[in-house]
Curated annotation (Swiss-Prot):
Its EC number is 3.5.1.98. This is Histone deacetylase 4. PANTHER family: HISTONE DEACETYLASE (PTHR45364:SF13), HISTONE DEACETYLASE 9-RELATED (PTHR45364). The lineage of its organism: Eukaryota, Metazoa, Chordata, Craniata, Vertebrata. Residues 629-641 have a biased composition (Polar residues). It is linked to HDAC4 point mutations and chromosomal microdeletions encompassing this gene have been found in patients with brachydactyly and intellectual disability syndrome. However, HDAC4 haploinsufficiency is not fully penetrant and multiple genes may contribute to manifestation of the full phenotypic spectrum. One of its GO terms (cellular component) is transcription repressor complex.
């Protein structure tokens, strides 16, 4: 049938009838199923019969229009009904909402009212409690007042026969106040060592007699005890006390005896039972210890030269002639063993103080064994000290009170302080120049100082500062003081050398170039001292040849010899005019003074080293490179300079560079757990190389700090000045050259430190020096390899550098070490082709930026890219360079995330198909490797996530060694798992030394790279095949394993060899000898 019927018997075109109202349909006649009544066979050509009943009972024509109108009316009625119901619901909701709001507001008012009532009740209770307390206090005061009045009344009304020796409450309070003031005065006198300059004191001293009960013992007068002038009494002054009749006179008599003994003017009339030590104990004030320059006899303004009689009549005992006025450190300690209030220990971490050696209050029982051990070590120290000529330390160390009463925690400190004291007679003095001090603060005792300089300046008493650390145990505190002494000695020695050089430049300036003062870096003190020690250790006359002739021909002739010239003849001697005689004599005097100064500095160095070794701490200034005198030095301006012996040539092997100064670059928070890039990285690598013996097989070279000019070959001037200077030398720079204040550049990190971002921490004191040192170490190593002094090299440096851009530090990096080294190779050695391979798991965006348009530097990076979703987001395969550098920037960017992570098979395949073919076609002169090891297994996902083995990097290094004649330098970049980076560094150094590497596992050799790696390699080869022809034949081998690729290469090599052995050319016919005639054929 052409039309399908619906289950209800209606055709498809009549379906709208179903929209009728069901009530209306009920009135319609029901349909009759007549399907069974139809004949079974219907002719095909017959018209289909319509069996609907509505055709049989057809309605009028106007019925559909009416039906439609009724339907619309019903719809409108329904809508109106729904609208009414909706309004009713909304009204009900608003009514309930208002009702609930009123209830809530009422509850709030009720709650607030209750709270206010509670607060009012509480306040009322507090007021009542306060009133009760006030009333109770008033009642107590009234009772106390009544009680006192009753007592006073009883005292007034007492009978004469009763005893009255009991002192009243007022008298007891006065006595207690007097005793406390006296104790405070005694303690204050022990600290100040200075006689009061109050005018009331001088007036009172002359008015009061020795029998006055109101005057305290005058062995030492305190500034806090003021003697009032008659008629001038204040509320704070102490009134003289009336002695009662019942007070015993024994105490008064003892005081009188003491005062009479102290006021005797002549020491011959002193009592036999008053020894000298007693006076010293009772009166710690000494002539040299006092800071006052006037005697009490004539007031504060008179000089300190009054006689003993004047002192006696003023109540101050003079110095005893049998005791030296200039007491030593140990003698002052012995004199103060009975002091009532010992001085507090001052342990400043920055400057050693002589008060460190003062004894403690007394030894404890727990330190008896330690004191015995210290007593046993004293004779050994005395024997070692006996080697010093002219020393006075033996009686100090053998003093029994010092051993007996010295505190256990401070006795080693005192021994160390005494050991460091060197007599002035040891250093040769130059007339008119004075001696150079050995330490920043003198530790020499008063009995060893010349009388002309024994007077001390006035000072305030020392006490513990709020920032000073608490006293530690003996060993830790001694070690701290020794470190501080060593650092101060180095600082002082450096300052002396700079002052001497400045003085020499002033005396004999060179007209061709101005004098230049070197930059001063606090962290370079020990480094510069090592450099200058070579200059100090050489004999002065050996460094200045021709000086003996100058001594012989002082004012007559000066022989001029050529500098570093063996072929040219020396100029003939010329006579010096009489007018030039005086300058020659001045130069001769200056040379003699300079000779003595340098000898004195050498002597001080040796004495210091010997004293530190005597204290049990060996001090060595390390090795140094031989220094030649610069042409701008004062000596070279006037004297001939001898040709220095050439330095020892390093072994032609692998070079290593490392410096402990780079360890100081750390966050100020002091914790390395929250900072992956920490000092333990390079320290662990250096220890591993030493433990395995690889360090001994290599040549360790000395690094240096890169100059600001070298850094500016890659970075901007503002960036270099901001991150390449410390606070000391930054003040000398022009503020206009800096981009802005440091506060706008650095941020506060969550750990409490400071940094550029959450990764790149900044230490204001040490970060600039460490970053410059890392660049300088890489530059030194690269130049030694490029010039052929070393075979290859590995730089153990930090902070890394391949993320540092021209003006932006990021990713732990401040200066791009490898990029600076490459730029300097181009500028100074004219190296035409440089290959930089970066196998850090992060893309080296800074290195790419530096050489993006340079065709002489081929930059190849193997890194995790993940379509730009991995830090730093750069390094896409289509970043090929710009301008003339197109094609010389190759990014082997791995995509696909960590499903699965890349491993040895993927990196070996990338080297085989992309890196080595392009590098071989480029044919570099030097190979530099940004050797980051964060792709080694063991790193978390944010820092790498790949699963390369450490030995794989050894094989990658071995492949790169086949380029550039083996001139390759690896510089440490990333890598934060200590075990991983130590294993990888060991493998790379072993490969550089040419050692046999551990074989790769068979599984790695047979493993094919995963699909993500194959797609990444094919994309790179597709992009760069237009620039490098070698990639056209390696595209098909990207998905093969290492064994399959080697087998295929061997087969191709055999095929090429076989084809080369076959030749289709015809060999030329051999010529017959001319003398051999051709045989004629016989005639037929």
């Amino acid at each position: 049938m052409s039309s399908q019927s619906h289950p209800d018997g209606l055709s498809g075109r009549d379906q709208p009838v179903e929209l009728l109202n069901p009530a209306r349909v009920n009135h319609m006649p029901s349909t009759v199923d007549v399907a069974t009544a139809l004949p079974l066979q219907v002719a095909p050509s017959a018209v289909p019969m319509d069996l609907r009943l509505d055709h049989q009972f057809s309605l009028p024509v106007a019925e559909p229009a009416l039906r439609e109108q009724q339907l619309q009316q019903e719809l409108l009625a329904l809508k109106q009904k729904q609208q009414i119901q909706r309004q009713i619901l909304i009204a009900e909701f608003q009514r309930q909402h208002e009702q609930l709001s009123r209830q809530h507001e009422a509850q709030l008012h009720e709650h607030i009212k209750q709270q206010q009532e509670m607060l009012a009740m509480k306040h009322q209770q507090e007021l009542l409690e306060h009133q009760r307390k006030l009333e109770r206090h008033r009642q107590e005061q009234e009772l106390e007042k009544q009680h006192r009045e009753q007592k006073l009344q009883q005292l007034k009304n007492k009978e004469k026969g009763k005893e009255s020796a009991v002192a009243s409450t007022e008298v007891k309070m006065k006595l207690q106040e007097f005793v406390l003031n006296k104790k405070k005065a005694l303690a204050h006198r022990n600290l100040n060592h200075c006689i009061s300059s109050d005018p009331r004191y001088w007036y009172g001293k002359t008015q009061h007699s020795s029998l006055d009960q109101s005057s305290p013992p005058q062995s030492g007068v305190s500034t806090s005890y003021n003697h009032p002038v008659l008629g001038m009494y204040d509320a704070k002054d102490d009134f003289p006390l009336r002695k009662t009749a019942s007070e015993p006179n024994l105490k008064l008599r003892s005081r009188l005896k003491q005062k009479v003994a102290e006021r005797r003017s002549s020491p011959l009339l002193r009592r036999k039972d008053g020894p000298v030590v007693t006076a010293l104990k009772k009166r710690p004030l000494d002539v040299t210890d006092s800071a006052c320059s006037s005697a009490p006899g004539s007031g504060p303004s008179s000089p300190n030269n009054s006689s003993g009689s004047v002192s006696a009549e003023n109540g101050i005992a003079p110095a005893v002639p049998s005791i030296p006025a200039e007491t030593s450190l140990a003698h002052r300690l012995v004199a103060r063993e009975g002091s009532a209030a010992p001085l507090p220990l001052y342990t400043s971490p920055s400057l050693p103080n002589i008060t460190l050696g003062l004894p403690a209050t007394g030894p404890s029982a727990g330190t008896a064994g330690q004191q015995d051990a210290e007593r046993l070590t004293l004779p050994a120290l005395q024997q070692r000290l006996s080697l010093f000529p002219g020393t006075h330390l033996t009686p100090y160390l053998s003093t029994s009170p010092l051993e007996r009463d010295g505190g256990a925690a401070h006795s080693p400190l005192l021994q160390h302080m005494v050991l460091l004291e060197q007599p002035p007679a040891q250093a040769p003095l130059v007339t008119g120049l004075g001696a150079l001090p050995l330490h920043a603060q003198s530790l020499v005792g008063a009995d060893r100082v010349s009388p002309s300089i024994h007077k001390l300046r006035q000072h305030r008493p020392l006490g513990r500062t709020q920032s000073a650390p608490l006293p530690q145990n003996a060993q830790a505190l001694q070690h701290l003081v020794i470190q501080q002494q060593h650092q101060q000695f180095l600082e002082k020695h450096k300052q002396q050398f700079q002052q001497q050089q400045l003085q020499m430049n002033k005396i004999i300036p060179k007209p061709s170039e101005p004098a230049r003062q070197p930059e001063s870096h606090p962290e370079e003190t020990e480094e510069e001292l090592r450099e200058h020690q070579a200059l100090l250790d050489e004999p002065y006359l050996d460094r200045l040849p021709g000086q003996k002739e100058a001594h012989a021909q002082a004012g007559v002739q000066v022989k001029q010899e050529p500098i570093e010239s063996d072929e040219e003849e020396a100029e003939p001697p010329r006579e010096v005019e009489p007018g030039q005689r005086q300058p020659s004599e001045q130069e001769l005097l200056f040379r003699q003074q300079a000779l003595l100064l340098e000898q004195q500095r050498i002597h001080q160095l040796r004495n210091y080293q010997a004293s530190m070794e005597a204290a049990g701490i060996p001090v060595s200034f390390g090795g140094h490179r031989p220094l030649s005198r610069a042409q701008s030095s004062p000596a070279s301006a006037t004297f001939p300079v001898s040709v220095q012996e050439p330095p020892t040539k390093p072994r032609f092997t692998t070079g290593l560079v490392y410096d402990t100064l780079m360890l100081k670059h750390q966050c100020t928070c002091g914790s390395s757990s929250s900072h992956p890039e920490h000092a333990g990285r390079i320290q662990s690598i250096w220890s591993r190389l030493q433990e395995t013996g690889l360090r001994g097989k290599c040549e360790c070279i000395r690094g240096r700090k890169a100059t600001l000019e070298e850094l500016q070959t890659v970075h901007s001037e503002a960036h270099t000045l901001l991150y390449g200077t410390n606070p000391l030398n930054r003040q000398k720079l022009d503020s206009k050259k800096l981009l802005g204040s440091l506060a706008s550049v650095f941020v506060r990190l969550p750990c409490g430190g400071v940094g550029v971002d959450s990764d790149t921490i900044w230490n204001e004191v040490h970060s600039a020096g460490a970053a410059r040192l890392a660049v300088g170490c890489v530059v030194e190593l690269v130049f030694k390899v490029a010039t052929g002094e070393l075979k290859n090299g590995f730089a153990v440096v930090r902070p890394p550098g391949h993320h540092a851009e021209e003006s932006t530090p990021m990713g732990f990096c401040y200066f791009n070490s490898v990029a600076v080294a490459a730029k300097l190779l181009q500028q100074r050695l004219s190296v035409s082709k440089i290959l930089i391979v970066d196998w850090d798991v992060h893309h080296g965006n800074g290195t790419q930026q530096a050489f993006y348009s340079d065709p002489s530097v081929l930059y190849m990076s193997l890194h995790r890219y993940d379509d730009g979703n991995f830090f730093p987001g750069s390094g896409a395969p289509d970043e090929v360079g710009t301008g003339p550098g197109v094609g010389f920037n190759v990014n082997m960017a791995f995509t696909g995330g960590l499903d699965p992570p890349m491993g040895d098979a993927e990196y070996l395949a990338a080297f085989r198909t992309v890196v080595m073919p392009i590098a071989s076609e480029f044919a570099p002169d030097v190979v530099l490797v940004s050797s980051g090891f964060d792709a080694v297994e063991g790193h978390p996902t944010p820092l790498g996530g790949y699963n390369l083995s450490a030995r794989c990097f050894g094989y990658l290094t071995k492949q790169l060694m086949g380029l550039a004649g083996g001139r390759i330098v690896l510089a440490l970049e990333g890598g934060h798992d200590l075990t991983a980076i130590c294993d990888a560094s060991e493998a790379c150094v072993s490969a550089l030394l040419g050692n046999e590497l551990d074989p790769l596992p068979e599984k790695v050799l047979q493993q094919r790279p995963n699909a993500n790696a194959v797609r990444s390699m094919e994309k790179v080869m597709e992009i760069h095949s237009k620039y490098w022809r070698c990639l056209q034949r390696t595209t098909s081998t990207a998905g093969r394993s290492l064994i399959e690729a080697q087998t295929c290469e061997n087969e191709e090599a055999e095929t090429v060899t076989a084809m080369a052995s076959l030749s289709v050319g015809v060999k030329p016919a051999e010529k017959r000898p001319d003398e051999e005639p051709m045989e004629e054929e016989p005639p037929l």
